Amino acid sequence: MQLNSTEISELIKKRIAQFDVVSEARNTGTIVSVSDGIIRIHGLSEVMQGEMIALPTGRFAMALNLERDSVGAVVMGPYTDLAEGMEVQCTGRILEVPVGRGLLGRVVNTLGQPIDGKGEIKNDGFSPVEVIAPGVIDRKSVDQPVQTGYKAVDSMVPIGRGQRELIIGDRQTGKTALAIDAIINQRDSGVKCIYVAVGQKASTIANVVRKLEENGALANTIVVAASASESAALQYLAPYAGCAMGEYFRDRGEDALIVYDDLSKQAVAYRQISLLLRRPPGREAYPGDVFYLHSRLLERAARVNEEYVENFTKGEVKGKTGSLTALPIIETQAGDVSAFVPTNVISITDGQIFLESNLFNAGVRPAVNPGISVSRVGGAAQTKAVKKLAGGIRTALAQYRELAAFAQFASDLDDATRKQLSHGEKVTELLKQKQYAPLSVAEQAVILFAVEFGYLDDVELNKIADFETALLDYANRTNTEFMQELTKSGDYNDEIKNTLKGILDNFKANNTW
């Protein structure tokens, strides 16, 4: 078939009209040095602070130092396959992690990728890891409790929804155990949990996941793992990634609890990155912005008001407040709470639970020191029953500690002093609690009622644990409906007081332990 010149001309014009050229401008640069997980890049003149830089290996680096003629970036993962001369390019976006209900029950890394071998995660979208915390106007005061299930914590240092309560102590004093038990106790409360493991052994994280699964709490929990074998960049970013996952629930009018285990290791990872980037070191070789590192993270834990939730969800959720409660963990060296990072985090949080190695070694577990443990806002959130009945506990323990110090030197003590010492010993014994055995509000109320109204006076010290077990068994068996109702309401009035009195009177009259 022959085409004449007119047809050829028309065909060419048609093809030209259909021809579509898309030009794409990309900001590229060249790696000039690679060392210890840090790369220096020449070029990238338009890169943003914190921007993701695409590497030729398929991984990403994060721009942290923007200098006059080069960019210092930290590699998100292994860096041994990178070399000088490789070309990299800007992505125009900052780090985002997947968020949503699909992450519940899963173990993910800092980037939100599954590492538990259970297949892909169906997420509801992505959220930036760095988000500005809610403002003053968007917040609401803390007045709802987060029950940890520990008598010592819920009675003396109560935690409210939206609070930041620091758990601080030396290594091997039960910090993680307390946080894990708090997560386990939320399995029926509707509070979603996020556990962020920073710089821990992979075997330790696996053990935590197994315990959560055994106790039926994993289905309600997201585990974000940045183990000791991960790069410093992933350890530094893990708490922010976990926080973004928790904010998904907070901003939709739900309650979430996040545990950072622990922020000491995150600070060490950030110090490592900063020193490798040649930022000037300050006290204990930490960079000058280590306070801001933790404050911008912990300020994101808040209770937000109904308007905030309604605006965020564009009217889909109305009349609901959301909260993100944070339990950061800090490890001290030889009980030194005046070190740089511990003092920073103490000043940022709304109180601290101080765990003491001396108490732990003496068998007092949880090893809470009631003298210096405090909750600055949790009192308003405490359930009425526990608040009313726990008033004398802290005083009894304070008097006991003071008298016990003098009693070491005095041989003959008067009856009143002896009675106070005996009462203090029994209260200390009663506040001991096994791991993975959280108590309900009603169970705590029964025990605190026994302390407050002298039902322990004729019980021998070595029989306190048996007394408690038998009492709770009796109360749950004979007054099931009342116990369930009290746990649900947390109220305290004359009727409840009389019922509790009846339970204890009947128990003391009819039981031996």
Swiss-Prot record:
Its EC number is 7.1.2.2. Gene3D superfamilies: 2.40.30.20, ATP synthase alpha/beta chain, C-terminal domain, P-loop containing nucleotide triphosphate hydrolases. Its main location: membrane. Belongs to the ATPase alpha/beta chains family. GO terms for molecular function: ADP binding; ATP binding; proton-transporting ATP synthase activity, rotational mechanism. The lineage of its organism: Bacteria, Pseudomonadati, Pseudomonadota, Gammaproteobacteria, Pasteurellales. ATP binds at residues 169-176. SUPFAM superfamilies: C-terminal domain of alpha and beta subunits of F1 ATP synthase (SSF47917), N-terminal domain of alpha and beta subunits of F1 ATP synthase (SSF50615), P-loop containing nucleoside triphosphate hydrolases (SSF52540). F-type ATPases have 2 components, CF(1) - the catalytic core - and CF(0) - the membrane proton channel. CF(1) has five subunits: alpha(3), beta(3), gamma(1), delta(1), epsilon(1). CF(0) has three main subunits: a(1), b(2) and c(9-12). The alpha and beta chains form an alternating ring which encloses part of the gamma chain. CF(1) is attached to CF(0) by a central stalk formed by the gamma and epsilon chains, while a peripheral stalk is formed by the delta and b chains. It is found in: Cell inner membrane. The record marks 373 as: Required for activity. It is a peripheral membrane protein. This is ATP synthase subunit alpha.
